[in-house]
Amino acid sequence: MKRILLMSLLAISTALSTQKPVELELWPDGAPNSNGITTPEQKLENNRISNVSEPTLTIYPAAKPNGLAVVACPGGGYIRLAMNHEGHDMADWFNAQGITYAVLKYRMPNGHHDVPLSDA
């Protein structure tokens, strides 16, 4: 009986566990162009961020992948990024469908239109 209970708990905890997200630097050897932003990245209300000069890709692997993946590029009018409600908050739903999900934190253009396109 104890063995059945232990095996059941193990199976349930394995099924409910999600893999941890992995954050990768998009340009580990330096970006191909600069947006001229030298001030530190700012965290704003509701987990919005601005002054992005170091782009990253956060990957949420699905526990049971089906071969599909989605990359979210949160909006914010090229002034800030809405990282939660247009990014990270959707990971659980996609992972439940077997879809690997990624969120791109891209650089702000700061007058250089090619910078965010380089990150995409």
Predicted segments with their positions:
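Serine-hydrolase catalytic-loop signature spanning alpha/beta hydrolases and amidase-signature enzymes
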Residues: 77-79, 101
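Bacterial Sec-dependent N-terminal signal peptides
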Residues: 1-21
